[in-house]
Amino acid sequence: MHMRSFKIAIDGPAGSGKSTISKKLSQKLGWNHIDTGAMFRALTLYLLENEVSWHNEKSLNQILDKINLSYSCNKIFLNQEDVSLKIKSLDVEKHVSSVALIPGVRTKLLKLQKEICANTPNLIMDGRDIGTVVMPDANLKIFLTANITKRALRKQQEDAQNGKITDITQIMKQLKERDHKDYHRHLAPLSKALDAILLDTTELSIDELIAKITTLIEKKRRA
């Protein structure tokens, strides 16, 4: 299989390591990386900053049409502003799962994500419905998982890197609530694609996981 046509879908719940691994893997391979979760967070940021209610779907859809999202050099831009750091706020984190349930939001972002898939070679895309909905024809599908304690510790470390001090018990509670929403939502729920490879990241380092995925890529390309 020609390298330029290779696309990888990486899915998993919050804290499973999918964004970190996808970013590191893309850097190692020199490929493109799209973090779809960042798209949902960017839209959430816009709604919060502009005090837009997401309960009136008709008016919300009109507003969504005016929002421009784009990726460049692993940074996400909201109406031409780099919001890569802003979207990591606790306020965005608190509301993003509710915004992600809105049909109009999912429709807008699914269209954008599919356009990116169609026009981007050597692509690694991570999220919650990439292998099942966004990129079902991906050359390699991976579903990452980890136990709740490990996921909470990772989230706490990520928060600390962003200057936020958070309580591990509260993080675990939030992760469980997020899991319930993600697995049970009506539109594009979080689920493992039938042909996805399950990798438990609980006891694996980033380097070990990247080595495993690199081996899987090589096997797929030889097939």
UniProtKB/Swiss-Prot annotation:
Molecular function, one GO term: CMP kinase activity
Q: Which family does it belong to?
A: Belongs to the cytidylate kinase family. Type 1 subfamily.
Q: Determine if Transferase is one of this entry's keywords.
A: yes
Q: Is the keyword Nucleotide-binding assigned to this protein?
A: yes
Top-rank taxon, per record = Bacteria
Descriptive protein name: Cytidylate kinase
- Binding residue positions for ATP: G12, P13, A14, G15, S16, G17, K18, S19, T20
Alphabetical GO CC annotations of the entry are:
cytosol
> Which pairs of positions does the record mark as disulfide bonds?
none
Catalytic activity line of the entry: CMP + ATP = CDP + ADP; dCMP + ATP = dCDP + ADP
The parts of the chain that form a coiled coil are none
UniProt enzyme class: transferase
Which keywords belong to this entry? ATP-binding, Cytoplasm, Kinase, Nucleotide-binding, Transferase
The protein's matches in InterPro entries, at most eight in alphabetical order, are given as: Cytidylate_kin, Cytidylate_kinase_dom, P-loop_NTPase
Localization terms from the record = Cytoplasm
Name the GO terms of the biological process aspect.
Answer: nucleobase-containing small molecule interconversion; pyrimidine nucleotide metabolic process
Q: What is its EC number?
A: 2.7.4.25
